[in-house]
Amino acid sequence: MSTMTPAEIVSELDKHIIGQAKAKKAVAVALRNRWRRQQVGEPLRQEITPKNILMIGPTGVGKTEIARRLAKLADAPFVKIEATKFTEVGYVGRDVDSIVRDLIEISVKQTREAEMRKVRTKATDQAEDRILDVLLPQPRAVGFGGNADHANDDNNATRQTFRKRLREGQLDDKEVELDLEQPSAGMDIMAPPGMEEMTEQIRSMFSNLGSGKKQRRKVKIKEALKLLTDEEAAKMLNDEEVKTKAVQNVEQNGIVFLDEIDKITSRNNEGSGGEVSRQGVQRDLLPLVEGTTVNTKYGMVKTDHILFIASGAFHLAKPSDLIPELQGRFPIRVELDSLSVEDFEAILDATDASLVKQYQALLATEDVQLEFAADGIRRLAEIAYAVNEKTENIGARRLYTVIEKLLEEVSFSAGNHAGERVTIDAKYVEHALGEVSQDEDLSRYVL
């Protein structure tokens, strides 16, 4: 669990997301409250439930990114789902319990990886021993007393020499023949609506049939070391312990991001055709958000302390169009701001993995030095903002389209410009995008 203070969390989020201070503050406090709850003694700890968050704002302003980065900071099981994918029980589509099943699968994978990291050093040593046994088979004991001891000393010295060469990568390209565990054969089964759990159990049953069998394979030592390390680490894990920790991790630290929640609201001016199913999804979500117990193949999972972050643009609907019970389960409401030209400018250049840095790194692989002048970045931001205003406002995602169109020619002919420097200034941007951005009909289709 993260022990970062709210200010530290916001500072980390600032490295990747521009603006949206209110939303960052809300999620930072929610994450810190989880740590605070763990410091409270029982039985009061069980009574403290997370305060779920409703983010309201247009597309492309950072709602999903805030939740995703938060989960990464907390090292918590995180699942993003779209509310429109779910239907009321009895209708065709996924039922809401599958959210928890997806979350527990992610948690098991995370927990297994964390446990394997703990035993990685020991597993690597054992994997090296297995490779050395193939490269240097133990000599048969011949003779008596001193001769056998002398042979063992020589063999140990040779093993140490080979182990050193193995660790330095000098033997990476040499091939060895090994008995490796055969991966269980995957089996795809089409799941009827609402039968995902039964399908998962059948798939698990069939996958276990082939497990444990050994297969003789010829592989390079570099790959063999990785495969054997994973195999040895897996042997050291206690599967029941992994499952228990994974369930506990979901119950205490799980984060569910419910996107497009505004699309399942009831609107008074519509016919009653789709209303039943929409309200049904809200009513099915209600016990999950309130706190219930869901049966999964890893055991019963309580959702009382899972943090739910819902988001929606709410262009046509209002948060008050949600059923009252569900509204009450999202006490923290945060409105995200639309992005300005200055925000676009910062997104292009100021974040840790900005678009400018990404494209510079990509073209550097072909020895093309890409430089963005300040006026070029400003003009790019202005064009992206203008196209959003004229056509559909898709927020920061517009920058991907604009910069891709801008660098289309450079990317295509990068091989012919090795060792050259390409400077993107306002004049270059205007030449590449000016005509398209001015023509509204053209920008509607191209940008």
Swiss-Prot record:
Xref: Pfam families: AAA, AAA_2
Entry's Gene Ontology BP terms: protein unfolding; proteolysis involved in protein catabolic process
One MF annotation (Gene Ontology) recorded for this entry: proteasome-activating activity
Keyword Nucleotide-binding belongs to the record: yes
Compartmental location: Cytoplasm
Binding residues for ATP: 18, 60-65, 259, 325, 397
Nucleotidyltransferase as UniProt keyword: no
Record's GO cellular component terms: HslUV protease complex
SUPFAM superfamilies, sorted: P-loop containing nucleoside triphosphate hydrolases
InterPro entries linked to this entry: AAA+_ATPase, ATP-dep_Clp_protease_ClpX, ATPase_AAA_core, Clp_ATPase_C, HslU, P-loop_NTPase
UniProt keywords, alphabetically: ATP-binding, Chaperone, Cytoplasm, Nucleotide-binding, Stress response
Xref: NCBIfam families: hslU, PRK05201.1
Function of the molecule: ATPase subunit of a proteasome-like degradation complex; this subunit has chaperone activity. The binding of ATP and its subsequent hydrolysis by HslU are essential for unfolding of protein substrates subsequently hydrolyzed by HslV. HslU recognizes the N-terminal part of its protein substrates and unfolds these before they are guided to HslV for hydrolysis.
PANTHER family (alphabetical): ATP-DEPENDENT CLP PROTEASE ATP-BINDING SUBUNIT CLPX-LIKE, MITOCHONDRIAL-RELATED, ATP-DEPENDENT PROTEASE ATPASE SUBUNIT HSLU
Family according to the record: Belongs to the ClpX chaperone family. HslU subfamily.
Assembly, per entry: A double ring-shaped homohexamer of HslV is capped on each side by a ring-shaped HslU homohexamer. The assembly of the HslU/HslV complex is dependent on binding of ATP.
Protein name: ATP-dependent protease ATPase subunit HslU
Organism: Burkholderia ambifaria (strain ATCC BAA-244 / DSM 16087 / CCUG 44356 / LMG 19182 / AMMD)
Phylogenetic classification of the source organism: Bacteria, Pseudomonadati, Pseudomonadota, Betaproteobacteria, Burkholderiales
Gene: hslU
